[in-house]
């Protein structure tokens, strides 16, 4: 099981049809619930409909206090139409006697962050949900709406220019905590360590196999073609290939001692969409060290060390 199993990302399951009795119990026991935000007003208050109960999350209760400035406004506005977690702080009735609820998402996030600060460490495998992507990285909800950054360079061993070449918004993924700045409550993730070593990936292929790949780099000396997210090979230089092209290639040689795979392009194909699920070789636990390179490789080893910030 992932190390954050006690506080999962928002929106992984559909919220129930709430009754007033369910909300009364939640006031008493402090249960964490989820619902879909219907509206955000000009003061950045959020509104939800929980069965017959009209609910409000005041702006000061929408996000954790360590999120401020423009980031805070974006964090609030981006919740409209999406599920959020909350506790039910109180129940009352409006002027017409209809039930209303006052909610807090901030309290849930503060509790989750304290659990993370106590128990989550570098190397921990976590489940996450991709909530936004930029060229420099993917923003991933790793529990109760707490967002960590997964830099593009850490997504896979095969190079990509943008996270959308590997993920889609809303996708459930696994990741590894790379850096946890507990003082500033900032978490950086990595991902490639879960996608298998060079040998693990290369073992799926044999010389003279013809397989589909994606062009990831066009150089003067050849083109890099991704065979798997953590494995690429090199073809001869071709002027008709562009990054992102799909190709069929024949594997001419596999050389573990040099971490090299020689390919020959057979045909140019339409680009492929990112898969719904990724081929994870590791799905839980805490990593201390991960070595991508084969043991007998003549090149300097590619290693990830997981250590705490001093």
Q: Could you tell me what each predicted segment is?
A:
Residues 1-310:
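Single-stranded RNA-binding regions, centering on S1/OB-family and related RNA-binding modules
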């Amino acid at each position: 099981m992932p190390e954050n199993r006690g506080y999962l990302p928002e929106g992984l399951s559909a919220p129930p049809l709430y009754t007033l009795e369910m909300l009364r119990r939640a006031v008493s026991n402090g249960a964490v619930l989820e619902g879909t935000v219907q509206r955000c007003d000009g003061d950045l208050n959020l509104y939800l409909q929980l069965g017959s109960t009209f609910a409000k999350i005041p702006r000061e209760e929408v996000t954790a206090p360590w999120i401020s400035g423009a980031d805070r406004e974006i964090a609030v506005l981006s919740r409209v139409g999406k599920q959020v977690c909350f506790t039910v702080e109180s129940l009352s009735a409006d002027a017409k006697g209809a039930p209303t609820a006052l909610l807090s998402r901030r309290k849930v996030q503060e509790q989750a962050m304290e659990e993370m600060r106590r128990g989550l460490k570098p190397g921990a495998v976590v489940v996450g949900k991709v909530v936004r992507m930029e060229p420099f990285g993917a923003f991933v909800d790793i529990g109760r709406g707490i967002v960590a950054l997964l830099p593009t360079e850490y997504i896979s061993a095969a190079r990509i220019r943008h996270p959308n070449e590997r993920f889609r918004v809303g996708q459930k993924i696994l990741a590894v905590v790379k850096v946890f700045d507990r003082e500033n409550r900032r978490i950086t993730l990595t991902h490639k360590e879960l996608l298998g070593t060079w040998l693990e990936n290369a073992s799926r292929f044999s010389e003279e196999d013809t397989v589909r790949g994606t062009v990831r780099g066009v150089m003067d000396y050849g083109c890099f073609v991704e065979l798997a997210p953590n494995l690429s090979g090199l073809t001869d230089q071709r002027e008709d290939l562009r990054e992102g092209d799909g190709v069929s290639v024949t594997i001419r040689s596999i050389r573990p001692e040099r971490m090299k795979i020689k390919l020959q392009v057979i045909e140019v194909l339409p680009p492929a969409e990112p898969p719904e699920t990724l081929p994870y070789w590791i799905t839980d636990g805490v990593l201390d060290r991960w070595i991508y390179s084969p043991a007998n490789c003549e090149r300097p080893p590619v290693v990830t060390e997981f250590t705490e910030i001093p």
